Amino acid sequence: MNFAAHAPVMLNEAVDALAPIDHGVYVDATFGGGGYSRAILSRANCTVYGFDRDPTAVDRARDWARAYGGRLALVNRPF
């Protein structure tokens, strides 16, 4: 099955408004492809909990999530 990539809408504007800080904890309740989570994690030494009810979305993220050294917790549940 081929999955089309989703481009987050207004990514920079949303993350700028959030203004992530070091040691902050954030929730991405519509994780999907993880675009917002990656952007948040790249801006600060923080933790993100990514929720998605689709197990495929969570499974696809497991490999790249390791690059964040445990700062991304993937949760396969609806928010």
Indicate residue ranges for each PLM-predicted region:
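S-adenosyl-L-methionine
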Residues: 1-23
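Conserved class I S-adenosyl-L-methionine
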Residues: 22-32
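Conserved short alpha-helix immediately C-terminal to the canonical SAM/SAH-binding motif I
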Residues: 33, 56-57
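Conserved SAM-binding loop of SAM-dependent methyltransferases across substrates and taxa
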Residues: 33-45
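Conserved SAM-binding motif I beta-strand of class I
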Residues: 47-52
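Conserved SAM-binding loop
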Residues: 61-62
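Conserved hydrophobic residues forming the short capping helix/wall of the S-adenosyl-L-methionine
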Residues: 65
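Conserved SAM-binding strand-loop segment of SAM-dependent methyltransferases
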Residues: 68-79
